[in-house]
Amino acid sequence: MAYARAVLTTASFALMAGCGLFGSSSDDAKPVATCPTAAILRPLSQTAVFAPGAPTQPVGVAFYGVLSEVTVKCERAGDAVRAALDVVVIGERGPAAQADAMTLQYFVAVTGPDQAILSKRSFPVRVSLPSGAKRGGITDHIEETIPLGGRPPGDLTIVVGFQQTPEAIDFYKHFRGR
C-alpha cells in the first residue's frame, strides 16, 4: 500500500512537471500593453495664479493649482488607441484670493520612446472652492484618440502638466511653491 502511494505521488509530480513543457507561452514573451503609461510631470505638477496687479511673490498668489493624479483606460481601435483620462486637479486659495473659483490650464501630451512630443493639447478646467474652504478639487474626464503609427501602445507615454504662464515660471524660479 505504501509502495503504491509512493508510485502514485511520484507519477503525479512527474505529470505536473511536464505540464510546463507543452505550454504556448515562453518566458521571453512580454505581454502587449494596450495603453500608454500616463504620468504627471512633477516639475509642472503645480502652478500659481496671481491676483491682478499683484507681485509674483507668495503674497500675490490668488490660487495654487496641483495636479494630483492621472489614470488612463484604453481601447484599441485599429492603428490607434482611444484613451479615457481622469485628471484630478486641486485648487488652493492663496493669500491674495478674492474669488471662490479659478480656471487653470493643463496639457496632455503624447511622447514617443525617445521622449519627443508627438502631440499636445491644452485643457481649461474650472475649480470651485466652497465658501470658507481652503481647498477644492475636480476630476476632469477627457477622451483622446492616439494614433500609433505602427508602434505598440507601450512605446508611448501620456504626460500631463500645467501650462505655465511667464509669471508662474518667474515665481517658481525664486520660490519653492506652496
What does each model-identified segment do?
Residues 1-11:
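Bacterial N-terminal signal peptides that target proteins for export
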Residues 15-18:
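C-terminal motif of bacterial Sec signal peptides marking the signal peptidase cleavage site
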Residues 74-117:
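Mid-length scaffold segments of soluble, non-membrane domains
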Residues 124-156:
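Short, solvent-exposed, Trp/other aromatic-anchored flexible loops in extracytoplasmic proteins
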Residues 163-173:
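Short acidic/polar inter-strand loop motif in beta-rich domains
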